């Protein structure tokens, strides 16, 4: 009788797990080694269902040029965009779980399973009351921190930065959902966190979709209000959305991330100068506290460069000029010599030019920090 009860519990757990795996990609039974000719532009334009996206993702070699051609058109339906993103995510899961991907010429590029597993295993959650190492927090350089404001994709920027400044140790801010690992990554959503999931093995680090870390780490979501999640040496192996998510021809790069959640839809007001600001001393103080957590986690892991962004100024509708002012105040008062470089990597996308950010998100940061807006080439 006891064995029967135990078997029922195990079957229930197994079914719940199988039903929860992303896009119903079972490992290893669903994995494929796509070698066929690439998908066509017509196939992308005519995506109708998740099954369509899944079948194309697992059968065909990826053509970033075909993808970009459809993606960058003005006539594409929003639902088609969502399915195209899901197609990319399925390709990425297949690559990570296979530990390889193929280029358009059929060249097989290896992903290092041990590196990806270690990134997930060593992903660490910081609590609200985490006791930071004092000596690391007090680090100071002789020169003041150099600030850049760059119009570009955060991963493109960090790759470019590491080529130019090879002795630096950058970490990238993941503007995360507080409650849902990866935000809407399973649904083809378009914010930064979901974009990172489509280009890396972050889904292994934050969600543990395949139950590989059960009993191996002692934390869960949500992200603490004044905490964060640090993921070291995540495998990054795809380029930006605008370029069609190309697979890297020379294999993965290893980049660390800090996941921290801005407040969603905070109360705002209009100040005497006609600018939108956060409303209430508590939300202003607590937003700065969140910003400081990002910098504290970076220092705790001995990074000298942080790739930041317009924190919460997209889908979460924080006012960018006020967020820039709060970052400026925090950095100038407490962190003016704590880092070599702080880089605000910002893209004005579909969440820009709204009621809360009518001038976009890049310009307010350039104005407040009195820095030019650099392109990736200029940077």
Q: What is each model feature region?
A:
Residues 2-306, 310-379:
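Macrodomain-like recognition of ADP-ribose-binding/processing modules
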């Amino acid at each position: 009788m006891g064995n029967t009860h135990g078997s029922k519990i195990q079957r229930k757990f197994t079914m719940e797990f199988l039903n929860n795996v992303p896009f119903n990609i079972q490992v290893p039974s669903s994995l494929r080694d796509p070698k066929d000719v690439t998908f066509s532009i017509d196939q992308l334009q005519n995506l109708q269902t998740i099954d369509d996206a899944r079948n194309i993702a697992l059968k065909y070699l990826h053509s970033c040029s075909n993808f970009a051609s459809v993606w960058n058109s003005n006539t594409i339906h929003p639902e088609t965009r969502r399915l195209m993103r899901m197609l990319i995510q399925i390709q990425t899961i297949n690559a990570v779980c296979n530990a390889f991907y193929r280029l358009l010429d059929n060249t097989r590029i290896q992903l290092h399973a041990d590196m990806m597993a270690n990134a997930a295993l060593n992903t660490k959650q910081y609590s609200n009351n985490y006791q930071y190492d004092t000596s690391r927090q007090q680090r100071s350089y002789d020169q003041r921190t150099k600030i850049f404001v760059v119009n570009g994709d955060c991963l493109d920027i960090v790759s470019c930065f590491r080529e130019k400044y090879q002795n630096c140790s950058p970490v990238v801010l993941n503007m995360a959902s507080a409650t849902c690992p990866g935000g809407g990554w399973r649904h083809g959503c378009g914010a930064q966190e979901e974009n990172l999931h489509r280009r890396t093995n972050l889904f292994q680090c934050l969600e543990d979709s395949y139950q590989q870390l059960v009993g191996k780490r002692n934390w869960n979501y949500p992200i603490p209000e004044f905490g964060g999640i640090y993921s070291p040496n995540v495998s990054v192996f795809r380029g930006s959305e605008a370029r069609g998510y190309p697979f890297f021809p020379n294999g993965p790069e290893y980049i660390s991330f800090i996941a921290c959640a801005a407040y969603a839809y905070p109360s705002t007001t209009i100040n005497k100068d006609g600018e939108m600001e956060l409303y209430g001393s508590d939300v202003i103080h607590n937003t700065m506290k969140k910003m400081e957590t990002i910098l504290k986690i970076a220092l705790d892991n001995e990074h000298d460069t942080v790739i930041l962004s317009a924190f919460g100024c997209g889908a979460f509708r924080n006012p960018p000029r006020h967020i820039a002012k709060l970052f400026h105040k925090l950095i100038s008062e407490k962190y003016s010599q704590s880092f070599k470089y702080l880089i605000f990597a910002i893209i004005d996308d579909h969440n820009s030019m709204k009621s809360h950010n009518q001038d976009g998100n890049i310009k307010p940061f350039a104005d407040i920090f009195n820095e030019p807006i650099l392109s990736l080439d200029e940077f």
